[in-house]
């Protein structure tokens, strides 16, 4: 009797696993949204001159970012930042010489969507590729 009960539980668990497969896209979404701890500063003015990715010089109001040289995010990639419910999506147009790891420089326009420019820098910001 005990063996039959254990076998029934095993069969039930296997059936539940097969009934609710997780797509690779869903797994990728969870992984993509799992990035935490970004350090964000803002840049603008002449620092926007001659962006690494080329193209038109961005303005302070454009929603753009500079990434560390070792970042997996490259030219044209879009990164979404979420800071205490305030959100912005930026396009990578530049590299940041003083940034490393998960430190990003974003334009004044992008930063101001997350916090006041007077704050200067943000820590523990969630981010993911979009």
Please provide the spans of the model-predicted regions.
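Secreted/periplasmic proteins
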Residues: 2-11, 15-130
């Amino acid at each position: 009797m005990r063996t039959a009960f254990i076998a029934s539980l095993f069969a039930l668990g296997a059936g539940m696993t097969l009934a609710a497969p997780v797509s690779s896209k869903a797994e990728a979404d969870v992984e993509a949204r799992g990035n935490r701890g970004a350090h964000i500063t803002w840049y603008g003015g002449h620092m926007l001159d001659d962006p690494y990715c080329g193209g038109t010089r961005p303005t302070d109001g454009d929603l753009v970012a500079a990434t560390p040289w070792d970042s997996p995010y490259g030219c044209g990639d879009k990164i979404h930042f979420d800071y205490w419910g305030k959100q912005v999506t930026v396009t990578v147009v530049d590299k940041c010489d003083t940034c490393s790891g998960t430190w990003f420089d974003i334009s004044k326009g992008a930063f101001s969507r997350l916090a006041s420019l007077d704050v200067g820098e943000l820590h523990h910001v969630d981010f993911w590729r979009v």
